[in-house]
Amino acid sequence: MNFRHVRMLLLLFTMILWNVLLNAWILERTRQINCFSYETALYSFRKHRVSGELLARMQEEAEEKGMSEKELFAVYFAEDGSVTDPGQLAVEALYAKRYQPQAYARICGYLSAVWDDLERFPVGTVASDGNAGVSFADSWMQSRNFGGERGHEGCDIMASVNERGIYPIYSVSDGVVENVGWLRLGGYRIGIRSPSGAYFYYAHLAEYAKEFEVGETVLGGTHMGYMGDTG
């Protein structure tokens, strides 16, 4: 083999190596750019499809890795729930934290705002009827036409007993009253800002349990009023 052939082989090897390295760089760069979709995470977070079994697996993985389960769920929501393996989510969380830190931190913050302050379910039992229950479904941004065409910015909790003023409504968290009183679309409502920044909005009340004032501090479990259909 003469020198010319050796040089051609070296050139070919260099080109192949360069092509492999370039493809690896492109794949890695693409992964960095697409490792976390804030828009998808926000949409999926609002859907909040989380089972008790998945939560338990996430908590176990997070404890093992020295992370918070919220860090894993932020990526889970960014994948629109398509990835459920906690180990894989832990790896993707590292990418998101490194290459999309602001978007990732915002979703983690939303999770903290909701999860960290929750103390109870907002609807209590009916003293006069132990079988009276409630149900709810994902109604976020469903079409509404009262007051004009719009999307529904809430989740309605429906009573099995269609009677105003028998289901007690409680604050799900500690917080400060930010809004209270009559609203055309929401009827009698009260809005509570929790310590972590979440805004919990209780609308369509039949009546208040007492006279609340803006700026007033409430505790989780505070009786705020009764379920109704005002507004």
Feature locations, PLM:
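Cationic-aromatic interfacial patches
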Residues: 2-98
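Extracytoplasmic/periplasmic, Sec-exported soluble proteins
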Residues: 50, 64-65, 99, 149, ...
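Surface-exposed, glycine-biased beta-strand/turn segments
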Residues: 89-188, 220
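A residue-level detector for short acidic-glycine micro-motifs
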Residues: 138, 159, 179, 204-207, ...
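Structural recognition of the beta-strand scaffold that forms the well-ordered cores
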Residues: 156, 168-171, 191-193, 200-204, ...
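Short histidine-centered loop motifs in beta-beta connectors
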Residues: 162, 170, 180, 196-221
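Conserved, short, structured surface segments that act as functional micro-motifs
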Residues: 191-193, 214-231
